[in-house]
Design a protein with these regions (language model features):
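A short beta-strand motif characteristic of beta-propeller blades
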Residues: 6-15, 64-73, 118-124, 170-179, ...
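Short loop/turn segments immediately following beta-strands, especially the blade-tip
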Residues: 1-2, 51-61, 104-113, 156-165, ...
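Residue-level detector of Asp-centered blade-edge/turn motifs that repeat once per structural unit
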Residues: 28-29, 86-87, 137-138, 193-194, ...
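Short glycine/acidic-enriched loop and turn motifs that connect beta-strands
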Residues: 39-44, 98-100, 148-151, 204-207, ...
Length: 284
């Protein structure tokens, strides 16, 4: 069976004055949720990252009002993807207005109510519409989805989670992986915990989650000993016309999807960790 869509667990960000959610991630303990907001219908501060406190870890229905937020429009007016360093002291926001990844330093881990400052800006020159972003576990590889060209670009970081790109901290583009065989409009990206599975959301003509297995963890070079294999896709179109991003809880038994036009964060229960099946969703 495929994932079970749990309608009762849908989180309506529209009721929190958020109109176009782009991406969602959690703190490592699951008690904070961060939503990239590209447009706010009643004010001009819509290009921001919103922080919610969850009273129960990874339970999005336990979120209260917006606890804190960071306006990022001064760096990029079209924020799309978000990721944090493992420690939570660095936040990375990718935007397709400036085609860049902006790195912010947080005074307190996973807390936007603390002092948050822009640390580095890294320009993405491989695709004109960068969207989703992810890292391997130690931050020495960064993955950026190219919506325009249908690809995932991999970058090597000399220092983990450091985009300063100077002497000793070089950031290099090392390969490109095409998703066009599965989706021509990739947007969000996520990995399982050990990097042997990759999930890419397709948007528009193919509203689905595509699953790949990686022979070598977090390695998309797709050569001998590093094969990347497409194993199937899961249809999201019944729940969202524009799914943009996805993430999982800590053990991969719940999948969360950002439904942009519906202004929702959707929740799916999985029968086994990171097992999205390849059938239509079960409704509950």
């Amino acid at each position: 069976a495929g994932p079970t869509f749990v309608n009762a667990d849908t989180f309506d960000v529209g009721t929190r004055n958020v109109n176009k959610p782009q991406n969602v991630v959690f703190s490592t303990d699951g008690l904070r949720m961060f939503v990239v907001n590209n447009m706010n219908p009643t004010s001009n501060d819509g290009d921001r990252v919103d922080q919610y406190h969850l009273s129960t870890k990874f339970d999005i229905t336990s979120a209260g009002t917006i606890q804190a937020f960071k306006i990022v429009k001064n760096e990029d007016s079209a924020p799309r993807g978000i990721a944090f360093s493992a420690s939570g002291f660095s936040m990375f926001v990718v935007g397709d207005a400036g085609n860049e990844v902006n790195e912010y330093t947080l005074q307190t881990a996973f807390d936007l109510s603390s002092n948050v400052s822009l640390e580095n800006t890294f320009t993405i020159s491989q695709d004109s519409n960068p969207a989703g972003i992810a890292f391997n576990d130690n931050g020495t590889r960064m993955f950026v989805v190219g919506f325009n060209d249908g690809e995932v670009n991999t970058y090597s970081l000399a220092t983990g989670f450091d985009l300063s790109n100077g002497s000793g901290t070089e950031v290099r583009h090392i390969n490109v992986f095409s998703t066009t065989g599965q989706t021509s409009k990739p947007n969000g990206i996520a990995f399982n915990n050990d990097g042997t599975m990759m999930f890419v959301i397709g948007m528009g003509d193919d509203d689905n989650v595509n699953k790949y297995t990686l022979e070598s963890p977090f390695d998309l070079s797709n050569g001998s000993g590093t094969a990347v294999t497409s194993v199937g896709s899961f249809d999201l179109s019944n729940e969202s016309t524009v799914p943009r991003a996805l993430t999982f809880n800590e053990d991969g038994t719940v999948m969360y999807v950002t439904a942009t036009f519906e202004s929702d964060i959707l929740s799916y229960d999985l029968d086994a960790p990171f097992d999205i099946g390849f059938t239509d969703p079960i409704l509950s």
